[in-house]
Amino acid sequence: MINKTKRLMVPRTVKIPRKTYFWGPTPLPGRHKADHSVTLLTIIRDYLRLSDKEREATRILANGLVKVDGKVVKERKFGVGFMDVIEISGESYRVVYNNQGALVLVSESKDRANMKPLQVKNKVIAPGNKIQLGFHDGRVMVTEDRSISVGDVVIASLPDMKITEIIKMQPGNKAFITGGSHVGETGTISKIEIKESSSANLVHFDEGFTTVKDHVFVIGSPRFTFTMPSGEVYP
């Protein structure tokens, strides 16, 4: 089994120099898809530049200095993805897409570093007549709240993962675009177009653009808005 990838073949979502080294780390199977995740080794060495060598980055992790979503992680090939919160030496960062579609780190404020937006990707009935929700980062949660639908975003507290807010996928709400030609942009939903064929459902925005529904991540409603981080960007 190959556990590393040539740097020239690393997905473009990972923003690293392509010719500095021959090999690039491959994320272990985890919550995020491999082509939409970045290893902690890459985060420490190439994004934040807290180390020059893999051995130094591994030592930082082994000392328990890195948290992901409020929990210590020591595996250097652990993959982090969209909306994950990384804490290193008291500084917090959130993983987001830039307008080229690459995953980058943005400095996050202390009051928002304990919040995790999670988009519902699937919803099934669980034993006990409860609802099981599957989220964009691979997490699964059981709840009794039947009002949550696929496409909605819940705001969970970290690290206990308790739902504090629900943002519906509906016209009038704000959204962040996670793919396509408008990746990294935000806009206000004007209309959701449901296709009766096998074509992808479309979402239209007040700003004049349209994208497929799978690329829309709602972040705000009249009741509550999750403010995207606007601090320093790495790398």
Swiss-Prot record:
Fetch the InterPro entries from UniProt: Rib_uL2_dom2 (IPR014722), Ribosomal_eS4 (IPR000876), Ribosomal_eS4_central_region (IPR013845), Ribosomal_eS4_central_sf (IPR038237), Ribosomal_eS4_KOW (IPR041982), S4_RNA-bd (IPR002942), S4_RNA-bd_sf (IPR036986)
SMART domains, A to Z: S4 (SM00363)
Any one cellular component term from GO for this entry? cytosolic small ribosomal subunit
The UniProt entry, under Gene3D superfamilies, shows: 2.30.30.30, 2.40.50.740, RNA-binding S4 domain (3.10.290.10)
Q: Which Pfam families match?
A: Ribosomal_S4e, S4
- What SUPFAM superfamilies does the record point to? Alpha-L RNA-binding motif
Q: Which protein family is it in? A: Belongs to the eukaryotic ribosomal protein eS4 family.
Residues in domain S4 RNA-binding? 38-99
- Superkingdom of origin organism: Archaea
Task: Name the keywords, alphabetized.
Answer: Ribonucleoprotein, Ribosomal protein, RNA-binding, rRNA-binding
Single biological process term from Gene Ontology: translation
GO molecular function term, any single one = structural constituent of ribosome
* Annotated organism of origin: Thermoplasma volcanium (strain ATCC 51530 / DSM 4299 / JCM 9571 / NBRC 15438 / GSS1)
What is the name attached to this protein's record?
A: Small ribosomal subunit protein eS4
